[in-house]
């Protein structure tokens, strides 16, 4: 018994020892031990001459961008002491001094990849950059910040490849290694193979039973079935490509495909050729192929006598031996239904890849469709322009969807159309301004949209052209029956109705301007001297100069509206004092100057407030009659008071009675001052270089005119229905549309200022607030607030109080220059 006990005890001790040994063996990390030994050796080499080896030694063991781990171990047995985590933007570890120090400067990236060397990377240390390299068969993965095995399908086209030793270690055993595989690189697994897919991914596949992978052809080939069998032996082996009249038999120790005699088919149940219809012994639903059909076709029995030809994207055979259709139509155009199908968008301006479909054996295994929504859609530039180009939000770049830029979008044309919103003047500016493809670079980098637009357009005026082709940016003379540029309204072209030939070019000099609604395109205004011309050279400033006003000081002309109105008012408000007849002014145009001044003098002119001197002696003054009843006064009364006068050279002293006091004559009524027509101010409203409205401010130099203006403004008459527009009277000829077919206008009929209701409105507007159809306020001198309408020069309008601070010595008149 003692021997048995000792044997059992020995077995127990051996078992315990074995367990302890394997526990220690498996827990021991040889790689970590080797690294720590190298660290200790390096530290000893560099410091032992100065200081002894410490009991605990630290080193940087892991780096994750700005975060790093310092591992501390005991130097006597290399066992772990502890680990600490640190941020290199805060502190850095000094290996030789074994202490931490404050970071001197921030480092953007501690680890960076090298695009030209996939297996290398750069580590930025405290002393500078250090280039490191991954082991062979590995590459650096920046996302994971570590070396990973090289992709097995990297650099390989889609297809089947033999499974060598390295691929087996990496893909099957999951033990990637950096060892040298060159000795067995010609060896491969007999049945396993690598399938590289079109999307760059891979799969490990295995050939069916009795098949071996042929590395040369990349196909699974059947193993030899005729070994030890006689010639003529028919095999129960029916490959997918075997036709209905074919079978496999042995010849010379190898299997070959044999064919039945004409008009016969092979009965796979009887294993012999028979003369009958293929459906006769298989029935409805049976499928078969013949030599006269395509690779993607097969016959399907409808009954025992008829079959239907089926055409597929891809023909496959199931486990039951029957043919069926498979595959996706999107893969039909790819060789063998395998590959990558790129989705490309092409238009007049840009070309880009919007996505991809990856197929394998006619089946879609991956599909990517990027968000190609137009980033320019519904975008307005300078509040009126839209771009006639589509630029995607994303495109496919390097197999992934990425933000679209000019680096991953191909530019087919440097120019693209620019369209403007509809406007009240029916002006089409697509031939005036053309977009440049460089605009997309600014728009995709977050630049101000209006600035990016203005800096990346080509204007017709820049190349001294009347118009540009919207697609090519080339100079053109015709675009329809007429062509003009509102950004350079010096001229206009008249063409044939088809727009094929130029008939004439109209040049607009002083006194003429572009009138878009006239058939001859020419408007006239004696005061206009191209005041709406834009002097800027920068396209950005030009496209932003859509609405502005020019203020001009000029002389009143002989036949302009100021002379006409002031003459009428002067005639009405000047009369002679006693006869109450209107003083007819007379013009003397010989005194008109250039620049013209008009001074009109009335008959019996007299300046207002002048002083009339009464003569001391009036020999023609009548003597008053004495009508008192009584004795007649004596011709000579010696007792009356007399004044004696002695005249030199006279005969002596004489006396003369005191003359009675003279009754003064009433002074005549003041006569009117002369009508002076001197200065006027012109306010031209401009839509780019197109003059739209002209406000004339006539300066009054006569008190009688100033008084008359006050009286006219105080006694304004208003037609029924125009009460909300009574304040139009501040500016003559001002018009406002109030909706419901009511249009009101301020007029002067020679006697009074009246706001009349037009029988038929001259203009109707969809937007009453802006008095326009497109919502743009072109007329800056008509104001609308709370259903009330007022005409007032813009610089005199008080919007808060809805009041017009009209100048008492000014008369205002408004012209619509385009309609």
Curated annotation (Swiss-Prot):
InterPro entries per the UniProt record, alphabetical: BaculoV_Vp91_N, Chitin-bd_dom, Chitin-bd_dom_sf
Top-level taxon of origin: Viruses
Gene Ontology CC: extracellular region; virion component
Cystine connections: 207-220, 260-273
Zinc finger (C2HC BV-type) residue numbers: 147-196
GO MF annotations in UniProt: chitin binding; zinc ion binding
Keywords assigned: Chitin-binding, Disulfide bond, Glycoprotein, Metal-binding, Repeat, Signal, Virion, Zinc, Zinc-finger
All copies of domain Chitin-binding type-2, residue ranges: 223-281
Leader sequence residues: 1-18
One Pfam family hit: CBM_14
Keyword NADP applies: no
Region called Disordered, residue ranges: 650-671
Glycosylated residues in this chain: 210, 588, 609, 752
Subcellular location: Virion
Pro residues compositional bias, start-end: 658-671
Function: Probable capsid-associated protein.
Protein name: Capsid-associated protein Vp91
Organism, as annotated: Orgyia pseudotsugata multicapsid polyhedrosis virus (OpMNPV)
């Amino acid at each position: 018994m003692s021997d048995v006990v000792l044997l059992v005890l020995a077995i127990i001790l051996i078992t315990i020892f074995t367990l302890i040994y394997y526990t220690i063996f498996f827990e021991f990390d040889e790689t970590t031990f080797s690294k720590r030994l190298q660290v200790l050796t390096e530290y000893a080499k560099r410091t032992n001459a100065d200081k002894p080896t410490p009991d605990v030694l630290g080193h940087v063991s892991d780096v994750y961008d700005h975060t790093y781990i310092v591992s501390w171990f005991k130097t006597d047995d290399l066992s772990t002491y502890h680990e600490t985590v640190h941020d290199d933007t805060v502190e850095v570890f000094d290996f030789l001094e074994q202490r931490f120090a404050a970071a001197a400067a921030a480092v953007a990236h501690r680890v960076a990849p090298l695009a030209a060397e996939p297996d290398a990377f750069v580590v930025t240390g405290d002393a500078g950059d250090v280039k490191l390299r991954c082991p062979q068969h590995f590459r650096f993965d920046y996302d994971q910040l570590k070396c990973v095995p090289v992709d097995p399908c990297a650099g390989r086209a889609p297809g089947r490849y033999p499974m060598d030793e390295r691929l087996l270690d990496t893909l099957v055993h999951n033990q990637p290694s950096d060892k040298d595989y060159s000795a067995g690189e010609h060896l491969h697994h007999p049945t396993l193979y690598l399938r590289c897919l079109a999307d760059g991914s891979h799969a490990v596949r295995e050939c069916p039973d009795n098949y071996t992978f042929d590395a040369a052809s990349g196909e699974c080939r059947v193993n030899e079935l005729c070994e030890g069998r006689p010639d003529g032996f028919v095999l129960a082996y029916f490959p997918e490509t075997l036709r209905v009249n074919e079978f496999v038999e042995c010849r010379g120790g190898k299997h070959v495909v044999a064919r039945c005699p004409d008009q016969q088919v092979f009965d796979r149940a009887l294993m012999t050729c028979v003369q009958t219809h293929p459906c006769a012994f298989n029935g409805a639903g049976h499928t078969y192929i013949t030599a006269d059909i395509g690779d993607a076709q097969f016959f399907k029995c409808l009954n025992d006598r008829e079959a239907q030809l089926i055409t597929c994207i891809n023909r496959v055979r199931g486990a039951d031996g029957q043919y069926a259709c498979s595959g996706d139509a999107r893969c039909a155009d790819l060789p063998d239904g395998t590959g990558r199908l790129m989705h490309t968008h092409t238009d007049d301006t840009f070309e880009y890849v919007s996505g991809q479909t990856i197929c394998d054996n006619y089946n879609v295994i991956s599909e990517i469709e990027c968000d190609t929504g137009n980033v320019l859609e519904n975008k307005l530039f300078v509040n009126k322009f839209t771009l006639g180009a589509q630029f995607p939000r994303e495109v496919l770049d390097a197999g992934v969807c990425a933000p679209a830029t000019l680096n991953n979008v191909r530019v087919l044309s440097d120019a693209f159309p620019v369209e403007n919103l509809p406007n009240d003047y029916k002006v089409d500016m697509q031939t005036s301004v053309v977009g440049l493809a460089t605009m997309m670079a600014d728009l995709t980098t977050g630049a101000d949209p209006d600035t990016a637009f203005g800096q990346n357009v080509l204007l017709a005026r820049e190349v001294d052209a009347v118009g540009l082709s919207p697609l090519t940016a080339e100079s053109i003379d015709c675009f329809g029956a007429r062509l003009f540029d509102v950004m350079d309204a010096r001229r206009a072209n008249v063409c044939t109705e088809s727009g094929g030939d130029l008939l004439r070019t109209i040049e607009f000099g002083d006194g003429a301007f572009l009138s878009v609604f006239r058939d001859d395109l020419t408007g006239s205004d004696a005061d206009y001297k191209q005041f709406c011309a834009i002097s800027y050279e920068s396209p950005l400033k030009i496209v932003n100069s859509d609405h502005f006003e020019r203020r001009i000081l000029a002389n009143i002309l002989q036949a302009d509206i100021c002379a006409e109105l002031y003459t009428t008012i002067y005639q009405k408000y000047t009369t002679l004092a006693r006869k109450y007849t209107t003083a007819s002014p007379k013009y003397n145009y010989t005194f008109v100057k250039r620049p013209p001044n008009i001074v009109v003098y009335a008959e019996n002119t007299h300046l207002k407030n002048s002083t009339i001197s009464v003569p001391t002696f009036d020999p023609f003054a009548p003597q008053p009659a004495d009508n008192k009843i009584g004795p007649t006064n004596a011709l000579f009364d010696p007792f009356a008071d007399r004044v004696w006068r002695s005249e030199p050279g006279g005969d002596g002293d004489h006396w003369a009675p005191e003359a009675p006091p003279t009754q003064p004559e009433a002074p005549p009524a003041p006569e009117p001052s002369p009508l002076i027509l001197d200065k006027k101010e012109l306010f031209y409203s401009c839509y780019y270089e197109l003059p739209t409205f002209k406000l004339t401010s006539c300066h009054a130099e006569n008190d009688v005119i100033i008084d008359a203006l006050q009286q006219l403004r105080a006694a304004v008459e208003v037609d029924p229905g125009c009460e909300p527009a009574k304040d139009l009277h501040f500016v003559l000829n001002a018009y406002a549309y109030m909706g419901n077919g009511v249009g009101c206008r301020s007029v002067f009929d020679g006697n009074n200022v009246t706001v009349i209701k037009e029988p038929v409105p001259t203009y109707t507007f969809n937007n009453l607030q802006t008095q326009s159809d497109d919502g743009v306020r072109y007329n800056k001198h008509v104001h609308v607030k709370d259903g009330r309408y007022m005409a007032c020069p813009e610089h005199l309008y008080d919007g808060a109080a809805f009041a017009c601070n009209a100048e008492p010595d000014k008369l205002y008149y408004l012209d619509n220059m385009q309609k």
